[in-house]
């Protein structure tokens, strides 16, 4: 009986150890001088996270574990409040759920995104900071541990300061609170890399995407910015996401 118990206990510990070996812990830090409300979105058919939205005060931190495999994105909403009807609304990157939790809704552009593809078994992770849906605040993604390149993906600059007038999203006080991407603004194949311009050869960078790239060379600036915007790390690292790095 004792021998059987030892075997069962040993097997249970092995399963627990294996099950958690490659789960990624995502650490969030808000270095912005204002409150943000991060949102999470899991891609279809992937395990869901424990929360889809939360509040993060200036200088506050938060941790979230991802199951594996996992594919999804994070962003931060700004200028949020509860209106007279009790609906939670945000000035930028709102997910239109009416709540702090996004409940499966993505960010309404413009929004700076942190995107992840984390495989099972400690394989090669892919991650990026994307401005394909526009920009609303600076952000960085830094692997913690892991092997290989494991470089920081980031957009530390305030792109709003160099945003062309035709792409600007303004707040109620007239200030620029976010910067639309050309795809979101104009919706044409030239900027969205949709047919008939749906290959890297037929959809090169544009003057608008180069504004994003020049401000944030370590971020995805448009749909086919794979060589400049995609980062990899092996060995099951954890990640630190910093708002206003």
Swiss-Prot record:
UniProt keyword list: Allergen, Disulfide bond, Glycosidase, Hydrolase, IgE-binding protein, Secreted, Signal
Principal subcellular localization: secreted
Cross-referenced InterPro entries: Osmotin/thaumatin-like_sf, Thaumatin, Thaumatin_CS
EC class (word): hydrolase
UniProt xrefs under PANTHER family: OS03G0233200 PROTEIN
Extent of the signal sequence: 1-23
Protein family according to the UniProt entry: Belongs to the thaumatin family.
Other information: Most abundant soluble protein in ripe cherries.
Protein's UniProt name: Glucan endo-1,3-beta-glucosidase
One Pfam entry name: Thaumatin
Catalytic reaction annotation: Hydrolysis of (1->3)-beta-D-glucosidic linkages in (1->3)-beta-D-glucans
Sections of the chain in a coiled coil: none
Subcellular location: Secreted
One function term, GO molecular function aspect: glucan endo-1,3-beta-D-glucosidase activity
This enzyme's EC code(s): 3.2.1.39
Tissue: Abundantly expressed in ripening fruit.
Disulfide bonds: 32-244, 80-90, 95-102, 150-233, 155-216, 163-179, 183-192, 193-203
Gene3D superfamilies per record: Thaumatin
GO cellular component annotations of the record: extracellular region
């Amino acid at each position: 009986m004792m021998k059987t118990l030892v075997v069962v206990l040993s097997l249970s510990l092995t399963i627990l150890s294996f099950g958690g070996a490659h789960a990624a812990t995502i650490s969030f830090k808000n270095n912005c001088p204002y409150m943000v409300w991060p949102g999470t979105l899991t891609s279809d058919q992937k395990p869901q996270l424990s929360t889809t939205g939360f509040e993060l005060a200036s200088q506050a931190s938060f941790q979230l574990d991802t199951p594996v495999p996992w594919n999804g994105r994070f962003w931060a909403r700004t200028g949020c409040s509860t209106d007279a009807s009790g609906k939670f609304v945000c000035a930028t990157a709102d997910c239109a759920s009416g709540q702090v939790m996004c409940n499966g809704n993505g960010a309404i552009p413009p929004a700076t995104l942190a995107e992840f593809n984390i495989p099972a078994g400690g394989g090669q992770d892919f991650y990026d900071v994307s401005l394909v849906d526009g920009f609303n605040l600076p952000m960085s993604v830094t692997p913690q541990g892991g092997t290989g390149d494991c470089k920081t993906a980031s957009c530390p600059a305030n792109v709003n300061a160099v945003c062309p007038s035709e792409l600007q999203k303004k707040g109620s006080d007239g200030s620029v609170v976010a910067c639309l991407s050309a795809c979101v603004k104009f919706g044409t194949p030239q900027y969205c890399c949709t047919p008939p311009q749906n290959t890297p050869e037929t959809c090169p960078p544009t003057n608008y995407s180069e504004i994003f790239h020049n401000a944030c060379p370590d971020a995805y600036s448009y749909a086919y910015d794979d060589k400049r915007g995609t980062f990899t790390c092996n060995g099951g690292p954890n990640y630190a996401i910093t708002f206003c790095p």
